[in-house]
């Protein structure tokens, strides 16, 4: 059988990323929600639990994919004129994370810009991201939360090991139903 080479696929060298099905109904996730929700409400008073999942990267991996999170993946919610906080994303590492183990990179103050999600998916902002991203050491069980408009990404995982994180997404309660109508993750997860 002949083998076809696609130059754009070379960017995927070393990629090994798994997203779980939604973990919303897990007892552990409910317990974590109960612990962190008071802090989330300090920043988004009408915060409502939207979704949670686990992302695992298998190293070594050079993959990055800078992006913004739900709801800003959808054009209606991705403009700075509506400068309200629409959502808060929570990352809880299930392994110790640092620069060698793929700690999430964030670009400070990037929530002040509009980021076209298709450009993000196509790698238009990769170079900008790598030049401006900051990474934080995050021991297992620590918490990083940020405005869902903030540009962020998994960073290269230089070691031959895995790294897993629990993600929890909170949204303003008045946009949840609209987002569920737009978001294809619900159809792929049986909701």
Regions found by a protein language model. Give the residues of each.
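Short, surface-exposed loop/helix-turn segments at secondary-structure junctions
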Residues: 67-75, 119-132, 181-186
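Non-heme Fe(II)-dependent double-stranded beta-helix
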Residues: 1-78
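Non-heme Fe(II)/2-oxoglutarate
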Residues: 3, 120, 143, 150-191
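Double-stranded beta-helix
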Residues: 84-87, 97-155, 175
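Short, glycine/small-residue-enriched coil/turn segments at secondary-structure junctions
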Residues: 77-85
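Secondary-structure boundary elements
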Residues: 39-48, 83-84, 94-100
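Short, structured patches in soluble enzyme cores that scaffold and shape functional sites
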Residues: 56, 68-70, 92-96, 106-108, ...
């Amino acid at each position: 059988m002949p083998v076809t080479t696609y130059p754009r696929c070379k960017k995927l060298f070393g990629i090994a990323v798994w997203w779980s099905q939604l973990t919303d109904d897990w007892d552990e996730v409910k317990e974590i929600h109960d612990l962190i929700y008071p802090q989330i409400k300090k920043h988004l008073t009408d915060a409502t639990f939207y979704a949670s999942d686990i992302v695992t990267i298998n190293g070594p991996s050079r993959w990055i994919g800078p992006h913004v999170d739900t709801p800003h993946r959808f054009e209606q919610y991705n403009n700075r004129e509506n400068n309200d906080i629409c959502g808060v994303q929570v990352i809880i590492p299930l392994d110790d994370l640092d620069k060698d183990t793929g700690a999430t990179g964030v670009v400070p103050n990037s929530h002040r810009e509009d980021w076209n999600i298709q450009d993000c998916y196509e790698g238009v902002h990769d170079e900008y991201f790598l030049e401006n991203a900051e990474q934080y050491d995050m021991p297992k069980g620590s918490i990083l939360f940020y405005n869902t408009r903030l540009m962020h990404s998994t960073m290269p995982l230089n070691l031959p090991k895995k790294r897993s994180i629990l993600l929890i997404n909170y949204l303003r309660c008045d946009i949840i139903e609209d987002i569920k109508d737009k978001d294809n993750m619900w159809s792929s997860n049986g909701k």
